[in-house]
Swiss-Prot record:
It is a multi-pass membrane protein. One of its GO terms (molecular function) is porin activity. This is Outer membrane porin C. Forms pores that allow passive diffusion of small molecules across the outer membrane. In R.aquatilis OmpC is involved in the adhesion to wheat roots. Belongs to the Gram-negative porin family. It comes from the Bacteria. The gene is ompC. Disulfide bonds: none annotated. One of its GO terms (cellular component) is pore complex. CDD domains: gram_neg_porins (cd00342). NCBIfam families: PRK10554.1. Transmembrane segments: none annotated. It is found in: Cell outer membrane. The keyword Chaperone does not apply.
Length: 342
């Protein structure tokens, strides 16, 4: 907090991560250092109405000064909070599917691989209008509700001047329910449905696989956080969700359906050590030309050590269980282990 006076508040957040990857995969091996800087502000309009906004930026620390392609805005949105009636904001924000994905995206470095930014409403996304209500209008303690709409983000072509086809979306909506069961237990569910753009169905690039009018996702999860123990598991069923990591891949597109599973267990010792173990898998079915294939599969073993609330060090070992197949080669999916130290 850097300012708090007369109903106006401004918070500053930041992070500097000196991060290095060790891997046999040349595309992953090497320096991955970055920094983040963010602001969050609030202004009290009256007893029931509060305005707020948030912005966060990430800058790479592993590129030459003349290169800035990896610098980007993570989130940026503004909104109004209406007391117990909830809040409404618009901008670049987290999709409602991440209300659950965040439960397992807590590993020292990796995790959250079955989701991804700019992939409909799975994670960070553009043009989202989000309504949130805590404790269901004050009627049900622990029941939080979110409803979201995302406007179309498309491109006339797949040129460098337009949006990458894998990161486009049509109009869509989603919602989530999170319930605090007490004693450290929570349960949640979420869904989203978005139309696919014509480019995502191969209008500009006939090589794109997996045509479909809509992308749909349904997810459920459980979490336990008490007594220094953290346990979480999330299962997701997707339809027409993307595969591949880049339009530069020789094969990219969408799986007819896929099942994603993430589970994590952690323990916080009083002296600052937090060991972590996790399992992550995304299995696609009926991928045109490839049949049933894993898109992600690994075990993660890591640990963080907190010197204090502002400083930590960590190591994270991603034990890749993916086989080297035609799909992994065509779609640019990594099959090598990675050790991250930061």
């Amino acid at each position: 907090e850097i300012y708090n006076k007369d109903g106006n508040k401004l918070d500053l957040s930041g992070k500097v991560d000196g991060l290095h990857y060790f891997s046999n995969d040349d595309s992953a091996d090497g320096d991955q250092s970055y920094m983040r800087l963010g602001f969050r502000g609030e202004t009290q309009i009256n007893n029931e109405l509060t305005g707020y906004g948030e912005w966060e930026y990430q800058a790479s620390l592993n590129t030459a000064e003349s290169e800035d392609a990896n610098n980007f805005t993570r989130v940026g949105f503004a909104g109004l909070k209406f007391g117990q009636w909830g809040s409404l904001d618009y901008g670049r924000n987290y999709g409602v599917m991440y209300d659950l994905a965040a439960w397992t995206d807590v590993l020292p470095e990796f995790g959250g691989d079955t989701y991804g930014a700019d992939n409909f409403m799975f994670q960070r996304a553009n043009g989202v209008l989000t309504y949130r209500n805590k404790d269901f209008f004050g009627l049900v303690d622990g029941l939080d509700v979110a409803v979201q709409y995302q406007g179309k983000n498309g491109s006339a072509t797949e040129s460098t001047m337009g949006r990458d086809v894998l990161r486009q979306n049509g109009d869509g909506y989603g919602m989530s329910l999170t319930y605090d069961l007490g004693e450290g237990f929570s349960a949640a569910g979420a869904m989203m449905a978005s139309t696919r753009t014509s480019e995502q169905n191969g209008r500009q690039n006939p090589a794109i696989i997996g045509n479909g009018d809509r992308a749909e996702t349904y997810t459920g999860g459980l979490k336990y956080x008490a007594n220094n123990i953290y346990l979480a598991a999330v299962f997701t069923q997707t339809y027409n969700a993307r595969i591949g990591v880049s339009s530069d891949s020789s094969h990219l597109g969408y799986a007819d359906n896929a099942q994603n599973f993430e589970a994590v267990a952690q323990y916080q010792f009083d002296f600052g050590l937090r060991p972590s173990i996790a399992y992550v898998q995304s299995h696609a079915r009926n991928v045109p030309g490839y049949s049933n294939q894993n898109l992600t599969k690994y075990v993660d073993v890591g640990a963080s050590y907190f010197f204090n609330k502002n400083m930590l060090t960590y190591v994270d070992y991603k034990i890749n269980l993916m086989d080297d197949t035609r799909l992994t080669r065509d779609a640019g999916i990594n099959t090598d282990d990675i050790v991250a130290v930061g």
